[in-house]
Structures are given as C-alpha cells and as structure tokens.
C-alpha cells in the first residue's frame, strides 16, 4: 500500500535559526499539530484540514532532489504526528547527500527514529508562556545526541528561569546544542543577554529568527 502525507508546502530558503542558520535548506511543512502554543507563528498549518497536497514519499523525495539542496528540514505542524513518517525518513535516507533535520515540538517520542542515518532533531522545550509546558515529554532529553538541539523560545523572565532549570536538571549542555530564542516582539533580546550573564550560562546560544528580519515576520514560504 502506498501511503500519502499531508504537505502544506515545500519551499527552499535559508535556515532562519539553529546550527545551520544562514544555510540553504528545503523545507517540507506538514499539516496538523497536537499542541496550541500561544505564540505559534504557523497556526494556519496546525489544523488537520488545512490546505495541503497529498503526496507519497516518492513524490516528496523527487521534489526535494530536484532542488539540488542538501539540507532538508521537516517541520509543521508536527511532522512526527504523521503515521508513516518513518517510511518517508527511510526513503530520504537512501540519498547520502541529504541531511535531514526534524523540527519537533517536544511532545512526541523520538526513540523510533534514532536508527536512521543523517537525521538530527531540533526539539522545542515549551516554556510556561506557551501554555504547553505540561505536554513536554521529558524522556526525550536522555535520547538527545551531540548532533541534536533543544530550543527554548522564551517570552518572559519566568520562561528563562524555567529554561535554565530544565537545562540544569537534564544536563543538556553536555548532551546537545542548547539554543535560546525570544518570542518575537514579546521580550527584548538584550534582556535575555543580561539574564545569560547573570547566570553565567556557558554553552547556550542566543539566536534571533533570521528570516523574520529579512522578510515580513508573517510571510509564508520563506
């Protein structure tokens, strides 16, 4: 049986954040999400009935390969909600030039995908202002590897306190990349720098969402 995936959009741009910020990537955005974060900037893609194309793994792979771009970011929505996502990842892994990044919201089990080559996770850890902190799957922290990233999107000092505590409790700085990002327009990045200085937060990286400064913050497909 050939499975299909609900794809909201496939586009090429630069990575706006994370370890590969500024590098070209092909983005594959799936519809549907199990969380409703207060600051979500892709709410339009969260509903299962959001506009989308039904695409097979072969069609998705073909469209990616046609771009000639090697970095591939699977995003959403929540890509790991797709019932047959392992099949798609395995198909993409057949191409050694592709490097896959899965942007996931922190509530989904990562363990089924650790056996696949050239796949990294950028896992959100939702903070109190998101309204979704209680949905975080803390078991995932022990699965993360040096190639993976935990991203904290903070909108307040309370959020930063929470991010600091999670980082210390789960010893994340010795395990994976740790990135801090402001909720766009909600907190002054300068205040985040001051907080990092107060804590002596070695090893964490503050990063702004580059694409929101290059293009309109609400623009799609960039």
Q: What does each model-identified segment do?
A:
Residues 1-31, 35-39, 43, 199-209, ...:
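Flexible, acidic/Gly-rich N-terminal and inter-domain linker regions that tether
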Residues 3-8, 12-15, 35, 39, ...:
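Amphipathic, alpha-helical segments enriched in basic
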Residues 5, 9, 24-25, 36-118:
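Conserved Radical SAM active-site core
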Residues 22-27, 37, 43-45, 56, ...:
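General N-terminal targeting signals
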Residues 27, 73, 149-151:
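Short aromatic/hydrophobic contact patches that present stacked aromatics
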Residues 61, 80-222:
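Conserved AdoMet/S-adenosylmethionine-binding subsite of the radical SAM
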């Amino acid at each position: 049986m050939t499975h299909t995936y609900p794809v909201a959009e496939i586009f090429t741009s630069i990575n706006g954040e994370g370890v590969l910020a500024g590098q070209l990537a092909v983005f594959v955005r799936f519809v549907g999400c199990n969380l409703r974060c207060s600051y979500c900037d892709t709410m339009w893609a969260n509903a299962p009935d959001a506009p989308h194309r039904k695409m097979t793994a072969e069609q998705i792979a073909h469209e990616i390969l046609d771009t000639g771009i090697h970095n591939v970011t699977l995003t959403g929505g929540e890509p790991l909600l797709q019932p047959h996502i392992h099949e798609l990842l395995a198909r993409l892994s057949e191409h050694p030039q592709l490097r896959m990044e899965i942007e996931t919201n922190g509530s989904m089990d990562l363990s089924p995908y650790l056996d696949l080559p050239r796949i990294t996770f950028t896992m959100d850890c939702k903070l109190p202002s998101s309204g979704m902190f209680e949905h975080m799957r803390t078991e995932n922290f022990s699965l993360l590897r040096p190639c993976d990233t935990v991203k904290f999107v903070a909108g307040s000092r309370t959020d930063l306190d929470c991010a600091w505590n999670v980082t210390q409790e789960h010893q994340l700085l010795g395990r994976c990349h740790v990135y801090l990002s402001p909720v766009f327009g909600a907190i002054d990045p300068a205040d985040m720098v001051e907080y990092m200085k107060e804590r002596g937060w070695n090893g964490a990286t503050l990063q702004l969402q580059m694409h929101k400064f290059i293009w309109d913050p609400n623009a799609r497909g960039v």
